[in-house]
Amino acid sequence: MLLLANLFWGLSFPTIKAMTLDLARLAPGSGSAFITAMSVAPRMLMSAAVLLVLQARDLGRTTALELKQGVQLGLFAAGGMLLQNDGLQFTAASTSAFLTQFYAILIPVYLAVRRRRNPGALVWICCALVMAGSAILGRFDWLELSLGRGELETLASSLFFMGQILTLEQPRFLGNRPERITLVLFATEALVFAVMGVATAPSAAALALPWSSAPLLLFNGLLTVFCTLGAFLLMNTWQPKISATEAGLIYCVEPIFGSLMALALPALFSRMAPISYANETLTWTLLVGGALITAANVLLQLAPRFRRAAAAA
């Protein structure tokens, strides 16, 4: 189910790119902060509204732990998205893609130090495969890497995403209802990005753009149904059933789906909105990088089963 969440998040890459291009066209005087806010706030508001309607009857039964976990998840997600989007303006996309996946290494390192227990050779091998695959997939160039503002912000965003993953693993939250914490998460992010949008809007009319443009409504609809409601409900429901280390590695599949969708969707979106957004092409980096990330996840999933089968025999 988490792979399905990755598929939905993969759709967000070309969709958000198309949306930001259209927003920049419709509001040429706006800054990057406003465009970032307007690419997130509407779908969070709509997603929160949908869940609010569905849960209205027993909303009063929301527990303090559900509120606490939902707010924590929302703040971690909002912080990660803010830093990632801002950092992308000061570094190459390939560098951003690679450094964002750094939580795949940070999670097992953090847990090993905290629990004083080595997770085992298999986990470290899978981490190495994932990082190598992410580097190849993003065409990362070590020679061009310098720790400037963009790189530091992207690394910081990875810490926030790690916090989001670890928050879902905490035992004290295991009794929380996924749909309830997801509602609180959406409301938290909606508030953060709505305030940011109002504070950075070039004019009051610019705030109405996501609701008055047919292409933007379509993009927001896709992001709301699949990348927000679908993906986050799946994540919050199923991730607590596995370890944070395993989840971190599985989430690294997301760029593969994003790269595959970028092979066809940009041209389609360019026909829906008057933007220039060309399809990407199939390259060896997608095939090799994707194969390494897939191999790491297959190995992580199958190895314990082989050990159990051998022990039973």
Regions of interest found by a model, annotated:
Residues M1-L4, S30-L54, K68, I125-A132, ...:
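Hydrophobic alpha-helical transmembrane segments of multi-pass integral membrane proteins
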Residues M1-M38, L75, G79, L83, ...:
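Glycine-/small-residue-enriched transmembrane alpha-helix faces in small-molecule transporters
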Residues G10, P14, L45, G74, ...:
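Hydrophobic/small/kink-forming positions within alpha-helical transmembrane segments
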Residues K17-S30, Q89, G138-L147, T200-P215, ...:
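Membrane-interface helix termini and inter-helical loops of multi-pass transporters
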Residues M38-A41, L45, L83-A121, L155-S158, ...:
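Specific alpha-helical transmembrane segments that line the substrate/conduction pathway
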Residues M44, T245, C252-A313:
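C-terminal-most transmembrane helix of multi-pass membrane proteins
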Residues A56-S96, S134-I136, T224-I242:
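Specific transmembrane alpha-helical segments of multi-pass solute transporters/efflux pumps
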Residues T100, V113-I136, L147-E151, A267-A296:
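Loop-to-transmembrane alpha-helix entry segments
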